[in-house]
Amino acid sequence: MTDKTIAFSLLDLAPIPEGSSAREAFSHSLDLARLAEKRGYHRYWLAEHHNMTGIASAATSVLIGYLAANTTTLHLGSGGVMLPNHSPLVIAEQFGTLNTLYPGRIDLGLGRAPGSDQRTMMALRRHMSGDIDNFPRDVAELVDWFDARDPNPHVRPVPGYGEKIPVWLLGSSLYSAQLAAQLGLPFAFASHFAPDMLFQALHLYRSNFKPSARLEKPYAMVCINIIAADSNRDAEFLFTSMQQAFVKLRRGETGQLPPPIQNMDQFWSPSEQYGVQQALSMSLVGDKAKVRHGLQSILRETDADEIMVNGQIFDHQARLHSFELAMDVKEELLG
């Protein structure tokens, strides 16, 4: 359906199902990373979140190191590190260390959102407005260090300086798309939970892109959810765990990933249903035939260079099977 090569990648939040633990979530992430490597997923990213009892990927760089040490060829990275939470120097050192240990296998995806609530921001010892205002400068500083330039002649990250680590900008708004275009960096859009501005952002990024030493032409990744099973009914049942989690988030409730339920109408209100369905509208839920049809439409409409797949499923084996089926569909469509 397309002549260009389209990579297929995987996003992991290290979800903690109800009754489980962070330790089990890390074990499950390792299973998933090994599956991703075996099946040919191009890259495997982990997302930074804080103070969320159902997500274990807070110390993103540490978890990347754990997975890299237990795989061989898989590209691993952050999807993303929320840069306003951190000193650029510390991030350069952390990812420089990772790239020194696992050369050519590490990506740094950067986000501008806090990935946390206001109390957690204070616990992270940061001042939100100032740090967000500094985001373009902080990104440029990281890129300069990785490209062996000296934004500060008295400070260098060791390791990190000159490491040529791939840097991505992530976002769900026009801001990140514009900045990625201006800096000549690859861009990933978080349509798996905030799809509203997807097409505007892709157009803005592509039409304003300035070639750089890192990237000659725009490269856009689109992140979607895929919940695949052997039948549509089974997939829709598994999907209710994510739907419940999104409802609870909107209610201001915390908790681990809930088990699936038979009837969402007994769980959410009509307004909650509308909001969650909008947020999760870039979700392909069904058997291979249904997922294939949906993926064809997304590729045609977005002209994405890369698809990143997310999927939070309560049962670990069902989650592994879903990512197996997703790759089956990719191979059938794109080789």
Curated annotation (Swiss-Prot):
Domain of life: Bacteria
Gene Ontology MF terms in the entry: oxidoreductase activity, acting on paired donors, with incorporation or reduction of molecular oxygen
InterPro entries: Bact_Lucif_Oxidored, CmoO-like, Luciferase-like_dom, Luciferase-like_sf
Oxidoreductase among keywords: yes
Keywords, in A-Z order: Oxidoreductase
Coiled coil: none
Keyword Oxidoreductase: yes
Assigned GO CC terms: cytosol
PANTHER family: LUCIFERASE-LIKE MONOOXYGENASE
Protein family according to the UniProt entry: To bacterial alkanal monooxygenase alpha and beta chains.
Entries under NCBIfam families matching the protein: oxido_grp_1, PRK10508.1
Name of the protein in question: Luciferase-like monooxygenase
